Amino acid sequence: MRRSSSVQRVALLSVHTSPLAQPGTGDAGGMNVYVVELATQLARRGVEVEVFTRRTSSEQPPVVETADGVRVRHVAAGPYEGLAKDDLPGQLCAFTAGMLHAEARHAERHYDLVHSHYWLSGQVGWLTADRWDVPLVHSMHTMAKVKNAALAEGDAPEPAGRVIGEQQVVEAADRLVANTDAERRELIDLYGADPAKVVVVPPGVDLATFAPAPGRAASRARLGVPADAEVLLFVGRIQPLKAPDLLVRATAELLREQPWRRSRLRVVVLGGPSGSGTAHPDSLADLVRSLDLEDVVRMAPPVARAELADHYRAADVVAVPSHNESFGLVALEAQACATPVVAAAVGGLRTAVLDDGAGAGTGEGTGLLVPDHTPRSWAAALRTLLDDPARRTAMGARAARRAQGFGWGATAEATLEVYRRAVQDRAAERGADPR
C-alpha cells in the first residue's frame, strides 16, 4: 500500500554523540542541541520521532522516552567506552545492523524518512534509507573540506576517508539541509551537490530559556560575580577548532595595553575536553599560567541550560573565536539573552552575528566580527565594547530582537516542509508501485 506525502514517523540518526549528552563535553556540542530541539518540536507537531545513537555505557538503557515523547534508542556498536571518534567508521556496519534489527519488528516502511546528522550518520542513513525505500535527508553540521581549508594551529586535518564519505552522502541524499546560504554554496562548490537538493533551514534557539533579563544584577548574584566586574565569556568544547586559546592570548594583549583593567576583568571559559582526552584543557590551563592570568581566567565545566542562560546574561561580551562554525548556536543563544557577541568572521557566524562595524558602529549590528585570528585584533575588538557600555546595551537590545526570529518552532516547520517534499518526490518516483 502506498503512503501519502504526509510525514508521520521519522528516524533521526546521531551516531557519534547522544542527544542526551551534556553539550560542551566529549563530542557533544551544538549538534546535540540541534537534534534534541528538532526532535522535540517535531514531536509536538504530531510526528513520531525515534533517535538512533551509539551506546557508550553499560548503564544506558536500550530505549529512553523523553518527557516530550521522543524515543532515543541506544544501539550497541563497538565497545561502550574508550572508542575514539576517529575509530567510529569501523563500527558503522554494526550500527547499521542494529538499526535494521530494530526496524524489522515494524511493518514495511514504518518510517517515512531518515534524517541523518553528520557524515558518520549519513553513511548509515544512506544504507538504511535505501533498504527501507524511503528518502534520506541529511544535515552535514561540519564539512571536512571546509575545516581543512582553515585548520587551527595544533589541529589535525580531516582524513581522506571522511572527505570520500561525505561526498558519497551528498550524492546519495534526497535532500541536504544547510544552516546558511554560505553552507549551501559550500555544498554546491566543494562537493558538487545538486542545487535543487540543497535547502537552507536556519537553526533556532530556545527562546523560553535564553531570554533577556532587566539588568545583569540578578544573574551575577546567582553566579557570585561582582556587580562591577567586566566579564568576557567563552562557551564550547576545549579544542583547537573553537580557539579558546585565542581569547586567553587576546586577554593578555588587552591587559598589556590597559593594565588598570586587571582588577575588574574576569574571563570565564565554560567547556570540557573534546572527545575522550584531556590534553586540550590541560594545555589551555598551562597557557593561562604561562601568561600569568590565573587571577583573571576561570575555567569551569559545562553547565545546565538554565545556568548557562545566567552566564550569558551576566557577561558583558560573549566571545566566539572559532576557526569555523556551520552556524554558531552559542552566538545565537548569547544574543537571545541580550548580550553582544564578538565572533570570528567565518562560516555561519557571519549569518548568526550582524557586524556593527568599526569605530562608532553602524547602529544596526548585534556584535562585532573579527576578520582574523590574531590576539591584537581580538584585543582591539574586545576593548572597543568594554570601553563603551552604551554601545553594548544598544547592541544587546538589537540582538535580542533579532533572535526572536530564530525560534526552534520555525526550524521544525521549515524542516517538516523539506520532509514533505522529499516524501512526495519519492512517492512520485514509485508511481504505481503497489508496495
Curated annotation (Swiss-Prot):
Mg(2+) binds at Y312, R313, A315, T339. The keyword Metal-binding applies. One of its GO terms (molecular function) is magnesium ion binding. Keywords: Glycosyltransferase, Magnesium, Metal-binding, Transferase. It comes from the Bacteria. UDP-N-acetyl-alpha-D-glucosamine binds at Q22, P23, G30, R237, K242, V303, E325, E333. It catalyses: 1D-myo-inositol 3-phosphate + UDP-N-acetyl-alpha-D-glucosamine = 1D-myo-inositol 2-acetamido-2-deoxy-alpha-D-glucopyranoside 3-phosphate + UDP + H(+). It is an enzyme of class 2 (transferase). GO terms for biological process: mycothiol biosynthetic process. 1D-myo-inositol 3-phosphate binds at H16, D27, A28, G29, G30, M31, N32, K85, Y118, T142, R162. Its EC number is 2.4.1.250. The keyword Cell inner membrane does not apply. InterPro entries: Glyco_trans_1, Glyco_trans_4-like_N, Mycothiol_biosynthesis_MshA. Homodimer. Catalyzes the transfer of a N-acetyl-glucosamine moiety to 1D-myo-inositol 3-phosphate to produce 1D-myo-inositol 2-acetamido-2-deoxy-glucopyranoside 3-phosphate in the mycothiol biosynthesis pathway. Belongs to the glycosyltransferase group 1 family. MshA subfamily. This is D-inositol 3-phosphate glycosyltransferase. It comes from Kineococcus radiotolerans (strain ATCC BAA-149 / DSM 14245 / SRS30216). The gene is mshA.
